[in-house]
């Protein structure tokens, strides 16, 4: 049986579809159609990063189960080799926001790869039905996701433009939790940045939900292979501040003094998602600055 659990940090009323997502025609309709309609804000003015000076393309490579795993890749023009950043999406998959994040990283000198973890079941990106999205996401378990990340690392190692000994990972919401998990599993990862990924089970979680979510980041602090930066919102209704404090304490107890969590006091969940009403420009920019500082020190040195 597939257990359906609420996506990390989100509730259905936080991501109600807007009039734009329901098909209101606008001059920029084709542009906005590339964003996840389940969360697109009517007043969104998302960042649009062009591909000038970049090579941006789709790729596919074999996962451990034989599935041809699709991914979006953006990298600077030229032979490289370039340091790598794996980008792990939110529950909405590889839609335009995630592709734009990849292009932003490529503009900063990285080769960015965003695997499409959910498409074995269905691509959630074009869906406006949140319950359908939840069912798709619930099917992507820990073993599959870690296997897909391992396959991504293998594929990176075979690319002439990739600096395969300098690899970072970042992810948002569902992907933020996966960052903590991956950093505890893969010694080839040199740094991670986790944006508002759930750290531990919700206070009202059932035993089934607790089991389905394992391993939880709070239980992995002693296994982290390299530095992790967590970026969290103080007004995130799905990730209470006391769980962030517990994670900070667990990192200290494990001796991971290089890893830290930044808590933006007034930020909600999804504060980096510029296509959603949750976007907080100042906090998103500060978090991005910190990401670039960490990756610059760990991947470009």
Task: Please provide the spans of the model-predicted regions.
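N-terminal secretory signal peptides
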Residues: 1-17
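N-terminal twin-arginine translocation
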Residues: 16-21, 30-46
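Short beta-strand element of the alpha/beta-hydrolase
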Residues: 81-90
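Primarily recognizes the serine-hydrolase "nucleophile elbow" in alpha/beta-hydrolase
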Residues: 151-217
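Short beta-strand/loop motif that positions the catalytic acidic residue
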Residues: 230-232
């Amino acid at each position: 049986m597939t257990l359906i659990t609420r996506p990390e940090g989100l509730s259905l009323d936080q991501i109600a579809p807007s009039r734009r997502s329901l098909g209101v025609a606008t001059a920029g309709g084709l542009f906005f159609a590339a964003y996840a309609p389940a969360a697109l804000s009517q007043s969104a003015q998302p960042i649009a990063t062009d591909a000038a000076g970049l090579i941006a393309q789709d790729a596919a490579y074999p996962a451990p189960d034989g599935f041809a795993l699709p991914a979006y890749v953006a990298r600077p023009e030229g032979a490289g080799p370039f340091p790598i950043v794996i980008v792990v999406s939110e529950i909405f998959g590889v839609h335009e926001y995630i592709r734009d994040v990849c292009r932003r990283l490529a503009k900063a000198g990285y080769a960015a790869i965003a695997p499409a973890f959910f498409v074995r079941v269905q691509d959630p990106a074009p869906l406006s039905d949140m319950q359908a999205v939840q069912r798709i996401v619930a099917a992507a378990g820990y073993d599959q996701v870690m296997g897909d990340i391992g396959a991504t690392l293998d594929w990176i190692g075979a690319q002439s433009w990739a600096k395969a000994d300098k690899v970072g990972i970042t992810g948002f919401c569902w992907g933020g939790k996966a960052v903590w998990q991956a950093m505890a599993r893969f010694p080839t990862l040199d740094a991670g940045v986790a944006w508002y990924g759930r750290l531990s089970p919700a206070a009202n979680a059932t035993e089934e939900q607790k089991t389905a979510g394992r391993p939880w980041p709070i239980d992995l602090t002693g296994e982290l292979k390299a530095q992790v930066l967590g970026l969290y919102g103080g007004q995130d209704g799905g990730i209470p501040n006391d769980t962030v404090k517990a994670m900070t304490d667990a990192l200290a107890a494990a001796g991971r003094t290089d890893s830290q969590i930044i808590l933006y006091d007034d930020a909600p969940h999804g504060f980096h998602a510029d296509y959603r009403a949750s976007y907080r420009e100042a906090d998103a920019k500060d978090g991005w600055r910190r990401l670039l500082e960490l990756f610059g020190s760990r991947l470009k040195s």
